[in-house]
From Swiss-Prot:
NCBIfam families in the record: trpA
The family this protein is said to belong to: Belongs to the TrpA family.
Entry-linked Pfam families: Trp_syntA (PF00290)
Protein name: Tryptophan synthase alpha chain
GO CC terms of this entry: cytosol
Keyword set, alphabetical order: Amino-acid biosynthesis, Aromatic amino acid biosynthesis, Lyase, Tryptophan biosynthesis
Reaction equation(s) it catalyzes: (1S,2R)-1-C-(indol-3-yl)glycerol 3-phosphate + L-serine = D-glyceraldehyde 3-phosphate + L-tryptophan + H2O
Alphabetized GO MF terms: tryptophan synthase activity
PANTHER family reported in the protein's UniProt record: TRYPTOPHAN SYNTHASE ALPHA CHAIN, CHLOROPLASTIC, TRYPTOPHAN SYNTHASE, ALPHA CHAIN
InterPro entries to which the protein is assigned, alphabetical: Aldolase_TIM, RibuloseP-bd_barrel, Trp_synthase_suA
Function: The alpha subunit is responsible for the aldol cleavage of indoleglycerol phosphate to indole and glyceraldehyde 3-phosphate.
HAMAP family per UniProt: Trp_synth_alpha (MF_00131)
Organism name: Desulfosudis oleivorans (strain DSM 6200 / JCM 39069 / Hxd3)
Length: 265
């Protein structure tokens, strides 16, 4: 059994939902980033989404855009991300998903990316801007291997399209809670039940909901209907606000514990 399936099964047995935490690798500095992520994992992150910084993150809002800029400015690249993954894997037992735009992967080479990601201990990848119809070059590298390809679904995805996207995915599905970019404000959780039910009619894959999640109350409401809750911009905003503070890792760990407590049914 792979780490992703094992994690969802273990949490379901405890009547918990997965806390999926996104952090841009190398923000605000490489060593600080490792310390922050390690503290967050120890505090309750179930699945880690490790962001590959990119110069043109069109799907992301200003908070994550700035985090990418800081990471790129200190020299973070794909090799840095692989090195960080390998370091985190020594202590973190949960799944590590690499979160990237396709351009860095294309420049690195799809086969090289898969080889080095797998060797570092990553469990899968989410490529934000790569639709199923254009994924063959990447997915052919690990055909038959237990390496997950996480897919995004939007609230506006037509029913007929949901099935095709889900069929090309593995691990879990990332269901976007609203249209717009990451970190958008005004999350309305009242429609989450209907969104999840619509997707569940097409797949048995776990569904994790993200975009605009910022409070423990948001987490608790989403966790009633989804298998996991994804938090990214709220973590990155807190990192940005805490730059220069000696206990930045502890600050992020405390917020992680608050979010994790809200995933318990």
């Amino acid at each position: 059994m792979n780490r992703i399936t094992e994690t969802f099964d273990r949490l379901a047995a405890k009547k918990e939902k997965a806390l999926v935490g996104f952090v841009t690798a190398g923000d605000p500095a490489i060593e600080t980033s490792e310390a922050i992520i390690r503290a967050m994992c120890e505090a309750g992150i179930d699945i880690l989404e490790l962001g590959v910084p990119f110069s043109d993150p069109t799907a992301d809002g200003p908070v994550i855009q700035r985090s990418s800029q800081r990471a790129l400015a200190n020299g973070t690249n794909l090799q840095t991300v692989f090195d960080m993954t390998a370091t985190l894997r020594k202590t973190f037992q949960g799944p590590i998903i690499l979160f990237s735009y396709y351009n860095p992967i294309f420049r690195y080479g799809a086969e090289n990316f898969y080889r080095d990601a797998k060797q570092a201990g990553a469990d899968g990848v989410l490529v934000v801007d790569l639709p199923p119809e254009e994924s063959a070059e990447l997915t052919s590298c690990w055909k038959g291997d237990d390496f997950a390809l996480i897919r995004l679904l939007a609230p506006t995805t037509p029913d007929g399209r949901i099935g095709a996207i889900a069929a090309s995915a593995s691990g879990f599905l990332y269901l976007v809670s609203m249209t717009g970019v990451t970190g958008s404000s005004g999350l309305d959780t009242t429609h989450i039940a209907d969104l999840c039910a619509k997707v569940q009619r097409h797949t048995a894959l776990p569904i994790c909901v993200g975009f605009g999640v910022s409070t423990a109350d948001d987490v608790a409401k989403i966790a009633q209907h989804a298998d996991g809750v994804v938090i990214g911009s709220a973590f990155e905003r807190l990192i940005e606000e805490s730059i220069g503070k000696p206990d930045i890792a502890g600050i992020l760990a405390e917020r992680t514990r608050e979010y994790k407590a809200a995933t318990k049914m």
